[in-house]
Every structure is written in C-alpha cells, then in structure tokens.
Curated annotation (Swiss-Prot):
Residue span, ACT domain: 69-144
Similarity comment: family membership: Belongs to the UPF0735 family.
Protein name according to UniProt: UPF0735 ACT domain-containing protein CPR_1404
Xref: HAMAP family: UPF0735 (MF_00707)
Listed InterPro entries: ACT-like_dom_sf, ACT_dom, UPF0735_ACT_dom-cont
Length: 145
C-alpha cells in the first residue's frame, strides 16, 4: 500500500479516535481553553490526546481552506528556498506563511503554512518532491487543518 493516509468509516474505528476529534474541536471552537479540560470533557486521557492529535483529522466535504504546516532544514546555499517555492507553485499550493530562522552552522530551519485546497497532487507527493531538492536536509509534516 502506498502512502500513509486512508479514508475509513468511523463506525469501524475504536471510539477513542472520535473522542480525540471531539477534544480538538472543543479547543478549536474555544469552548475550552486547556487541553486538560478538553480531554476531560471528551472522556480521554491527555496521553491518548497527545498520541493521536497530529494523526487524526476530520474529513472535509469541501477542500476549501485546507492548510498544511511543514518544517524543513535547509543548507545555507543560494537557490535552495527558491527551488522549494517553485515546487509549491508548480503543484498549486498557495503559501500562507514562511518563517525562516537564521542559518546556524550552515543550516536554516524553515516553516511553511500552505493552503492545499487547489493542489494538483497529494501532500506526500509534494513533500517527497521537496526532499529531492539539493540543499534540503529534512522535511517534516507538522499538522493539517
């Protein structure tokens, strides 16, 4: 099987996954302010929440407004970031934010937030293509909304 993502009917999954989604929703909607409160209301432990929070997402009926956050470590060389930006443009990603730290020991940390609602490929393909860029040392998926 290729890829890490599956679409699964929640009726066949353990109830804990839906409870994690519920806790995330409580936090997102501002109904609770702290993770402890969200997990208590959802009926799960904090450790369960932290274990699954970055891996469980609600399926959106529409692709509008979908965002992905990923981090990279790049070498301090001319053209590396430009090559990554070209890939993001080519696949139809809309860059919402870029945050780049100062290079230390020849490496810089870069964080991207991308609107993926108009992308022509899946996230894994995009990240794999970015990893192939000369000067990109590491690519890490952080979150998806």
């Amino acid at each position: 099987m290729e890829g890490n993502l599956l679409v699964i009917d929640k009726r066949v999954l353990p109830e804990v996954f839906e409870k994690v989604i519920n806790a995330k929703r409580l936090l997102k909607e501002g109904k609770v302010k702290e993770i402890t409160e969200a997990t208590k209301q959802a009926g799960i432990s904090r450790s369960v929440y932290y274990k699954y929070k970055d891996y469980i997402f609600e399926f959106a009926e529409t692709l509008q407004g979908r965002k992905v956050i990923f981090n990279m470590v790049v070498t301090h060389e001319k053209g590396v970031l430009s090559s990554v930006l070209n890939i993001l443009s080519d696949v139809g990603g809309n860059i919402l934010t870029i945050d780049q730290g100062l290079p230390i020991h020849g490496l810089a940390h870069v964080s991207f937030t991308i609107d993926i609602s108009t992308m022509k490929c899946d996230i894994k393909e995009m990240l794999n293509e970015i990893e192939l860029v000369h000067g990109v040392e590491k690519v890490e998926f952080v979150a998806m909304e």
